[in-house]
Amino acid sequence: MIKECRNVPSRLQRSGIRYHAGVIDTVTYRGRKCELSVNLGGNAGPGSRPKGTKGTGYFFIQEENNMTVWEELKARGLIAQVTDEDEIKEMVNNGKATFYIGFDPTADSLHVGHFMALCLMKRLQMAGNRPIALLGGGTGMIGDPSGRTDMRQMLTKETIQHNIDCFKKQMERFIDFSDGKALMVNNAEWLMNLNYVELLREVGAHFSVNRILTAECYKQRMERGLSFLEFNYMIMQSYDFYMLYQKYGCNMQFGGDDQWSNMLGGTELIRRKLGKDAYAMTITLLLNSEGKKMGKTQSGAVWLDPNKTSPFDFYQYWRNVDDADVIKCMKLLTFLPLEEIQEMEKWEGSQLNKAKEILAFQLTELVHGTEEAKKAETGAKALFAGGADTEHMPTTELAAEDFDEEGNIDLISLLVKSALVTTRSEGRRAIEQGGVSVDGEKVMDIKHVLSKDALTGDGVVLKRGKKKFNKVFTK
């Protein structure tokens, strides 16, 4: 069972841990003997205390228990489909798997869906397996049709490279890439120099068009229009697996459950071309109790980049999950021991709010560090209690051009700019229904305006409903 602590607890500091990056020591934690894996990303040398541990040090405690890695993955509900369970189980339990997960750089930040994959990579790395983070510098030029109803926007090479650079920085916060313990590879290395005729002969000959079109993602798109560009995606993803197998001995691919058909294509290509066995496993999709993908808000995706989704907003997203989803999120996304989560399953009523606070803090700490998690928690509690502490609240800064000639801005525009609503009509309804307040005063007038003077300096606090806040100001 795996637990993560950021900033080593004092009880562990007193237990005589050696702060060697990557070294595992035995310590006592909560009365149990545990193994401590210290991953400081090279920030600490042998025998030294870690420097600047806030946000940089990752301390993972592996507690002694009778569960194998595979049993824990199943108990947490992480596994959806597998090709050969016995073989995969044997390899991951004994630290013999070299596996990869692909990340297409479609944006300049990872999001919550990626975070779930990173957590799985970390769990398996701690068990001695070697993860490969495959960055889609090549496949990103095409775009994965899985889960799409339309064609993805074409990205330039420069945009894709920028996104890859952003991904790298974020991944290094979670995965230990030192000394070959994990690899970060860009598939542009082999895809961008492919000879098309050679690809058709060497790879295309092993794929049946009829079989490709039976894949769910392609069946859905056939009804709306599937470009030839996207049609090639399965072949290219399969070729990735084939190349990783040859170059790095990668014998497993993990990914979202919507990737199953593409992953099977890779195992089949390896079998046909090399006569070797390769394996695939899909991760449970992060869905809420209504079957909808989690990780989205009215203003868009929940990002791991604090400049795109603030630590406060990130915390609030998890603090506000539905009662029916909190335990599932605990199991899938946190490193809390299963026995602690199982105790929380018995909680009811107001106790569920405490469980949500634990979930929100754990995930904010994992992504943004202990200090930011504490700030978000303090800010959320102050706002919930009606306090005036707005230091850690998400903010929106207005520019001079946001005001009219008289130096005013209407409330509906403020709601849209602060992402408390997505459209003006939604903002109008929220005001008319009494769901909007300015500095604690409910506003029912849809024509309400605020002056630039009122917004200069500290600004005002906008509130929509009971849980959504934003401080709006101008300089």
Task: Please tell me what each predicted stretch does.
Residues 270-475:
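Conserved nucleotide- and phosphate/pyrophosphate-binding catalytic cores
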Residues 18-20:
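Compositionally biased, intrinsically disordered low-complexity segments enriched in Pro/Arg/Gln/His
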Residues 57, 62-259, 264-267, 274-279, ...:
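NTP-dependent nucleotidyl-transfer catalytic core
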Residues 40-48, 53-56:
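Low-complexity, intrinsically disordered Ser/Thr/Pro- and acidic-rich segments
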